[in-house]
UniProtKB/Swiss-Prot annotation:
One of its GO terms (cellular component) is mitochondrial inner membrane. It is found in: Mitochondrion. One of its GO terms (biological process) is inner mitochondrial membrane organization. It comes from Clavispora lusitaniae (strain ATCC 42720) (Yeast). Coiled coil: none annotated. This is Altered inheritance of mitochondria protein 24, mitochondrial. Signal peptide: none annotated. Residues 1-50 form a transit peptide. The keyword Transit peptide applies.
Length: 378
């Protein structure tokens, strides 16, 4: 019997460029730049976005005149420019569509000016109850530069932090629940579920810059053509797509492993055989395969459950390293410890000078006692 071997392209990890692209390649971090000063605004018609820090937790946006920039509410750290020339307003883009899909209705601060200015934004998102709930995992930026050749589907509901551009278009769509026929034929399967949540996603296209925030560090996994990448659904921040209806052509829910299927089939066969015979007729050699099949099903089924999806290339997937169980941490303020009551000696002090005119400070419980002691020294 001949054994066929298949070559598998290794997945390399290396430093990523400043901006993430949609071309296939290796697994890289997005981005890892050293913290620098806020760049001075320069005239022009192009908006510039730069992620700062390691990991990048701050984004600097240089905005030309008459071009609005949208920053998530509560994320603006500093503004460089003449404040009297900058107009600020709070908006909620596509709030009705997001509300119908069960998505997060985020408010953004819209900044526009008659002359160039720069904005410094933070990757942290505001919390509704900061005294009770705080984020346990820090957030970092992944900067995207769109030139019209590739679009992005932002799956994380709170990932869109900053966006601006002369021809940047944003829209909210419902996530497809079944894969396309073309993907089903390539996978040699039926139209299985995509594994995506029903809350929808934000489709970004056109020309401009976008800063996405993820928990932990954000990495770019570039999947080449005719290749697949199995990832946890909770770690996906965004996927590069070709149009607003391309997700069902590249994302499929990960089915159970073959070992799990074999185990379930073996357990079903054993169960059918056991029903046709009495329990007293069962032998040890019949019980062992049944127990082995049940154990294989219990162990293998959770390995590739509904929490994993397969992404088919060519495309780029942005992944966050922070797990879902680490995103929130409840903090309960305990009762304040009662401090000891203060006595008069804690806040009554007497200052005396010796013959060398050096001051001496000492505490006293009664000024009368200190005065009598001074009188005795005269």
């Amino acid at each position: 019997m001949k054994h066929l071997t298949r070559a598998v392209r290794p997945l390399h990890v290396q430093a990523a460029p400043v901006a993430a692209s949609a071309h296939p390649g290796a697994l890289s971090r997005v981005p890892s730049a050293a913290a620098v000063d806020l760049p001075a605004p320069t005239p022009g018609d192009q908006v510039r976005l730069q992620a700062l820090g390691s990991p990048p937790s701050v984004a600097s946006v240089a905005v030309p005149p008459s071009l609005p920039v949208f920053v998530r509410r509560g994320s603006v750290l500093a503004v460089s420019g003449r404040i009297d020339r900058i107009v600020s307003a709070f908006v909620a883009p596509m709030w009705l569509r997001r509300l119908t899909l069960g998505n997060i209705v985020s408010r953004y601060q819209r900044l526009v000016a008659t002359e160039p200015f720069a904005v410094l934004a933070s990757a942290s998102a505001p919390s509704l109850w900061p005294q009770l709930v705080r984020r346990a995992t820090p957030r970092s930026f992944a900067s995207l530069t769109l030139d019209g050749t590739a679009d992005w589907a932002v799956l994380k509901r709170d990932a869109l932090q900053v966006y601006a551009g002369p021809a940047l278009t944003l829209s909210v769509h419902a996530a497809p629940q079944r894969i396309s026929r073309r993907l089903a034929q390539s996978l040699n399967t039926s139209r299985i579920p995509t594994g995506l949540r029903r809350t929808g996603y934000t489709f970004v296209s056109g020309r401009g810059v976008v800063a996405l925030a993820g928990h932990g560090s954000v990495y770019a996994a570039r999947v080449a053509a005719d290749e697949q990448l199995t990832v946890a659904r909770s770690s996906i921040v965004a996927i590069s797509v070709n149009g607003p209806h391309d997700l069902h052509n590249c994302v499929a829910q990960m089915p159970q492993t073959q070992a799990s299927a074999a185990g379930s089939a073996g357990s079903a066969t054993s169960a059918a055989g056991s029903n046709s015979r009495k329990w007293t007729d069962l032998k040890w050699k019949d019980v062992v395969p049944w127990v082995r099949g049940v154990w294989s099903k219990l162990v293998s089924a959770p390995r590739w459950g509904s929490g994993f999806v397969r992404v088919s290339g060519p495309r780029t997937v942005l992944l966050q390293s922070g797990g879902a169980q680490q995103m929130w941490e409840h903090t309960v303020r305990g009762p304040r410890s009662a401090s000891a009551p203060k006595v008069s000696a804690d806040y009554l002090n007497v200052v005396t000078f010796d013959q060398a005119h050096r001051p001496e400070i000492r505490s006293t419980s009664d000024f009368g006692e200190a005065v009598r002691a001074i009188e005795k020294t005269k």
